[in-house]
UniProtKB/Swiss-Prot annotation:
Designated name of the protein: Non-structural protein V
Residues reported in the UniProt entry to bind Zn(2+) 2: C197, C209, C211, C214
GO cellular component terms, semicolon-separated: host cell nucleus
Main location: host cell
Biased composition (Polar residues): 145-157
Gene name of the record: P/V
Sequence similarity: Belongs to the paramyxoviruses V protein family.
Pfam families given in the database record: Soyouz_module, zf-Paramyx-P
Keywords, comma-separated and alphabetical: Host nucleus, Host-virus interaction, Inhibition of host innate immune response by virus, Inhibition of host interferon signaling pathway by virus, Inhibition of host MDA5 by virus, Inhibition of host RLR pathway by virus, Inhibition of host STAT2 by virus, Interferon antiviral system evasion, Metal-binding, Viral immunoevasion, Zinc
Biological role stated in the UniProt entry: Plays an essential role in the inhibition of host immune response. Prevents the establishment of cellular antiviral state by blocking interferon-alpha/beta (IFN-alpha/beta) production and signaling pathway. Interacts with host IFIH1/MDA5 and DHX58/LGP2 to inhibit the transduction pathway involved in the activation of IFN-beta promoter, thus protecting the virus against cell antiviral state. Efficiently blocks type I IFN signaling following infection by targeting host STAT2 for proteasomal degradation. Also plays a role in viral growth by promoting host RhoA-induced F-actin formation.
Length: 225
C-alpha cells in the first residue's frame, strides 16, 4: 500500500495562510460575474500560482449605493362596506340577522313575510304569496319523485297567465318582478314593477321606460311604498 503523504508544520501553516488570504480577498470587495472564477481562468500549478492567478483575474468593482427597503404600509381601511357592524352575539333576543341574499338598496315595492311553521302572512299580493309557496314546494320536492300536493302556479290554476299572449303588453306596460329568499322559518318575497322595455337583471333594480309607451304607474304598483 502506498504511504500517505506527510506535511511539515511549515507547509501546513503556508497552506492555511494562503487559503485564509484568498477568503479575505473575496470577502473584502463585491463580486460580479467578471470576477467569478471558471475553469479556464485557473492555470495549472501549485497553490501559490492559483492564488496569484485569482487575484490577477479579479477586477475591483465599485460598491453602489445601498437601496433602502420599502416599508410595507398596512392600511386600516376596510375594503368593503359592512351592512351591520353589531356582532350577532350582542344583538337583542329574537332579533333577525340581516339576510345577505336580499339587496340593501331596493326600489319601491312590497315585502311579504311568510312564516313556514305557522303559515302567517304579514303583507303582500296574491301573486307574490303563490310564487313563494310554489318556490318552497319546488325546493322541497326537487330530489324526490312524489307529485306536488298543490297545483298553485301551474297551467291548471285559473289565475295562471302565460306571458306573450296579450297584445296589450306589446304596446307598453309594467312587468312585475320578485326576489325570494328563505331566512330561518320565514320566506321573504320582495316585489316591484319595471317597464316592459327594461332589461331583466338578477338584482333588484328599478328602471325607467325607454320606449315612451309604458305608463309611470300601473294597477299592480299603485300600492307599492
Amino acid at each position: 500500500m502506498a504511504e500517505e503523504p506527510t506535511y511539515t508544520t511549515e507547509q501546513v501553516d503556508e497552506l492555511i495562510h494562503a487559503g485564509l488570504g484568498t477568503v479575505d480577498f473575496f470577502l473584502s470587495r463585491p463580486i460580479d460575474a467578471q470576477s467569478s472564477l471558471g475553469k479556464g481562468s485557473i492555470p495549472p500549478g501549485v497553490t501559490a500560482v492559483l492564488t496569484s492567478a485569482a487575484e490577477t483575474k479579479s477586477k475591483p468593482v465599485a460598491a453602489g449605493p445601498v437601496k433602502p427597503r420599502r416599508k410595507k404600509v398596512i392600511s386600516n381601511t376596510t375594503p368593503y362596506t359592512i351592512a351591520d357592524n353589531i356582532p350577532p352575539e350582542k344583538l337583542p333576543i329574537n332579533t333577525p340577522i340581516p339576510n345577505p341574499l336580499l339587496p340593501l338598496a331596493r326600489p319601491h315595492g312590497k315585502m311579504t313575510d311568510i312564516d313556514i311553521v305557522t303559515g302567517n302572512i304579514t303583507e303582500g299580493s296574491y301573486k307574490g304569496v303563490e310564487l313563494a309557496k310554489l318556490g318552497k314546494q319546488t325546493l322541497l320536492t326537487r330530489f324526490t319523485s312524489n307529485e306536488p300536493v298543490s297545483s298553485a302556479g301551474s297551467a291548471q290554476d285559473p289565475n295562471f297567465k302565460r306571458g306573450g299572449a296579450n297584445r296589450e303588453r306589446a304596446r307598453g306596460n309594467h312587468r312585475r318582478e320578485w326576489s325570494i329568499a328563505w331566512v330561518g322559518d320565514q320566506v321573504k318575497v320582495f316585489e316591484w314593477c319595471n317597464p316592459r322595455c327594461a332589461p331583466v337583471t338578477a338584482s333588484a333594480r328599478k328602471f325607467t321606460c325607454t320606449c315612451g309607451s309604458c305608463p309611470s304607474i300601473c294597477g299592480e304598483c299603485e300600492g307599492d311604498h
